[in-house]
Regions:
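Beta-rich interaction/scaffold domains
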Residues: 1-59
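Acidic, contiguous N-terminal accessory segments
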Residues: 52-184
């Protein structure tokens, strides 16, 4: 028999070359194989495999926000982020050119939605109540459209590509609208 891996439904977690990108929480991934014997070959049905996550799903306290497109993974720990009059959009200066459009559109959308002015600055670290954006994430499983958002006293967004960082702004705006200007 020859067995060939065809693919998974979550390529962000299990690549075609079988590289595993550890998810945030345990995630069920469906995989398919091609089985060949001589001139005959068959495609298997989907097999579900659980890929262990970085965090236990039991630590999630805050519910996953409902946004479109849906968040692929979520761990909601205790506490929340609240915007303030001092909130800023902080762009990693190494990616100033790549994130220029994001900064411009997020600023306009944020001001239209909240009625609050927000400044765009370039720095390597955010302050309290800031939105921080950077590229060059080491998590290659994020692919072009993925992002990792960490919420604490600031909101930090890491992406591999500017498209993923832009999608993060859309999720942020939807969550702020639903939760009276806070992010769980």
């Amino acid at each position: 028999f020859e067995i060939e891996f065809i693919g998974a439904d979550y390529e962000q977690i299990l690549d075609r070359d079988l590289t595993i990108h550890q998810p945030i929480v345990d995630t069920i991934v469906s995989v398919n194989y091609k089985v060949k014997k001589g001139d005959q070959e068959k495609i298997t049905g989907a097999y579900n495999v659980t890929i262990p996550g970085k965090n236990s799903p039991d630590i999630s306290i805050n519910a996953k926000p409902k946004v479109v497109p849906e968040l692929a993974e979520w761990v909601g720990t205790e506490g929340s982020f609240t915007i303030s009059d001092d909130s800023r959009i902080v762009i990693n200066p190494a990616y100033k050119d790549d994130l220029a459009y994001l900064a411009k559109t997020f600023k306009a959308d944020y001001q239209a939605q909240t009625g609050k002015e927000i400044e765009v600055v370039y720095a390597n670290t955010p302050g309290a109540h800031d939105f921080y954006f950077t590229l060059g994430s080491s998590d290659t499983g994020l692919k072009e459209e993925g992002y990792l958002m960490t919420v604490g006293d600031s909101v930090k967004v890491e992406a591999v590509d500017k498209t993923g960082a832009f999608w993060a702004t859309q999720s942020i705006l939807q969550i702020l609208k639903q939760n009276s200007n806070t992010i769980p």
